[in-house]
């Protein structure tokens, strides 16, 4: 894996703050990749499902709702999820404060492509690639043995404490959600967790995304189209500014976040484990000229050093294994080299292409 970026890193936030009237060429996407701000689906009021987890946990009908959302969309919003609302607001606010710090303070945590940990502004190491209009901060969270304390920001005050508290609440949510997803697939509650490597062996990471104002939002993206490489993603969205779009057929649906909701999406590893019953779905982020956005993505992933393939009970004569097994660390390394690229990586594992 590369240990340095192919070109000098430029903070997109700093670039935006200079008041540039146009988007520099390195951020201008090819015409077919540029954002769509109004789609037929959005105009028709089509939105991803919203699940009240009080109606889901431990209830047969709840399992059917989860399965329907995962099969039809690969995305859903959840309310009454158990994560403290005030904690959600405080950790989001702390990260917003971090990104308002002077650039020299943020650069103390500058990242490199070997681990991605820390403060950065690009994904992938392909030279001369078209870049996204965003900055981010990436942290390893689980297992705790791989955390790098030197990469955890010390400013603003209490941000480390908030990261720890938020991470712990979302970890518990992921464990419960993994049981529910397992049952929704017709498996024993603990089967999916076992396939991920076991509760104390799973991986997790946190990426905070910062999307600055953009002078020409129609020419670029905050995050290019991709599916998430891991197991499950729990997103704490910016409630004030929309931007996340989910692919629906040939178009895109802009998610309208519900107050105090978290957004769940299926990752590539769960698509593989479910033998294609549940599918990771392409999504992207659009930017705007008037407001900045902050969101927090918590990635719940398989243990990195075990092969991940279709769960045995989900392989039948009528539905043979669709994917080649692959270790998550190998899969993630390929993603990190290429950067966001639709669903090309998971599709490359299909046994009958």
From Swiss-Prot:
SUPFAM superfamilies: Clavaminate synthase-like. GO terms for biological process: defense response; negative regulation of defense response to insect; regulation of defense response to fungus; regulation of jasmonic acid mediated signaling pathway. It is an enzyme of class 1 (oxidoreductase). Jasmonate binds at residues 207, 332, 336. PROSITE patterns: FE2OG_OXY. Fe cation binds at residues 226, 228, 283. 2-oxoglutarate binds at residues 209, 211, 293, 295. Its cofactor is L-ascorbate; Fe(2+). It catalyses: jasmonate + 2-oxoglutarate + O2 = (1R,2R)-12-hydroxyjasmonate + succinate + CO2. Its EC number is 1.14.11.-. GO terms for molecular function: dioxygenase activity; iron ion binding; jasmonic acid hydrolase. PANTHER family: OXOGLUTARATE/IRON-DEPENDENT DIOXYGENASE (PTHR47991). This is Jasmonate-induced oxygenase 4. It comes from Arabidopsis thaliana (Mouse-ear cress).
């Amino acid at each position: 894996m590369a240990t340095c970026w192919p070109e000098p890193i430029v903070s997109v936030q700093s670039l935006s703050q200079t008041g540039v009237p146009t988007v520099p060429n390195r951020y201008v996407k090819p015409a077919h990749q540029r954002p769509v701000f109004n789609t037929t689906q959005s105009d028709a009021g089509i939105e991803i499902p919203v699940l009240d987890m009080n109606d889901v946990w431990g209830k047969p009908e709840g399992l059917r709702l989860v399965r329907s959302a995962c099969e039809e969309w690969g995305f859903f919003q959840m309310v009454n999820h158990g994560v403290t609302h005030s904690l959600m607001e405080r950790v989001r606010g702390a990260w917003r404060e971090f990104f308002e710090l002077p650039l020299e303070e943020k650069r103390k945590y500058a990242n490199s492509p070997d681990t991605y940990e820390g403060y950065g502004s690009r994904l992938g190491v392909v030279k001369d690639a078209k870049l996204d209009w965003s900055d981010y901060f990436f942290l390893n969270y689980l297992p705790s043995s791989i955390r790098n304390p030197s990469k955890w920001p010390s400013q603003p005050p209490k941000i480390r404490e908030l990261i720890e508290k938020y991470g712990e609440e979302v970890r518990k949510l992921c464990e419960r959600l993994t049981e529910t997803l397992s049952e929704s697939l017709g498996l024993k509650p603990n089967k999916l967790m076992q396939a991920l490597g076991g509760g104390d062996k799973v991986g997790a990471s946190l990426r905070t995304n910062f999307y600055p104002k953009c002078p020409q939002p129609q020419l670029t993206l905050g995050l290019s189209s991709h599916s998430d490489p891991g197991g499950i993603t729990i997103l704490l969205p910016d409630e004030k500014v929309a931007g996340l779009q989910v692919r629906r057929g040939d178009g895109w649906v802009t998610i309208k976040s519900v107050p105090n909701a978290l957004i769940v999406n299926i990752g590539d590893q769960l698509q593989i484990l479910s033998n294609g019953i549940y599918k990771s779905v392409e999504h992207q982020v659009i930017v705007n000229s008037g407001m900045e956005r902050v969101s927090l993505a918590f990635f719940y992933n398989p243990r990195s050093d075990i092969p991940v393939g279709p769960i045995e009970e989900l392989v039948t004569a009528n539905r043979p294994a669709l994917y080649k097994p692959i270790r998550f660390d190998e899969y993630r390394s390929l993603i990190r080299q290429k950067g966001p690229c639709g669903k090309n990586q998971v599709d490359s594992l299909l046994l009958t292409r």
